[in-house]
Amino acid sequence: MGIKIEKGVNKNNIELLCSWSNELGSVFQEQWMGTQVSYPLTYEKIEKLENKFSIFNEEEFIGMIQEVRIEEDNIHIGRFVLNPQKTGLGFGTEALKEFIDFIFKDKNIRSISLTVFDFNKNAKQLYDKLGFVVDEVIETPKLKYIMKKHR
């Protein structure tokens, strides 16, 4: 397994993301995109996202992750998705470890936060495993957690 994170997502890979997401439907899209991006996913909707990164295993594009916003000494990440055929194989763990290491290279960043829906059990398990802890619980409109990892 040779996971690499690279800034940006090219046109062909954006089209792959749309295909993976749209095939699995609106609930899947909400899991990884949140509620601010309407279904179905299109090239234009992903293209508009800033600070997005490609995830590769060796040379194969397998997913995307985003630095959503900077909040003083915290970076909020999200929109983390893998090719559905690559889940459950350790790629998500390795990709998130790489992204965490990349972010923490900036010594001014003290923490990383993310939001996860309660129904997205596999993602929450991954975040727990990598040291994220629940920082805030949001109960409406759908139960979700803001989780945070400190340096």
Task: For every predicted segment, state its role.
Residues 2-3, 7-85, 102, 106, ...:
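Acetyl-CoA-dependent GNAT
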Residues 76, 81, 113-115, 146:
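Conserved beta-strand segments that form the floor/walls of ligand-binding pockets within enzyme
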Residues 105-115:
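Conserved GNAT acetyl-CoA-binding A-motif
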Residues 80-91, 116-117:
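A short, internal acetyl-CoA/4′-phosphopantetheine-binding micro-motif in the GNAT/acyltransferase core
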Residues 93, 118-136:
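Conserved active-site alpha-helix within GNAT-family acetyltransferase domains
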Residues 114-124, 140-144, 150:
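Conserved beta-strand-loop-alpha-helix junction that forms the acyl-donor binding cleft
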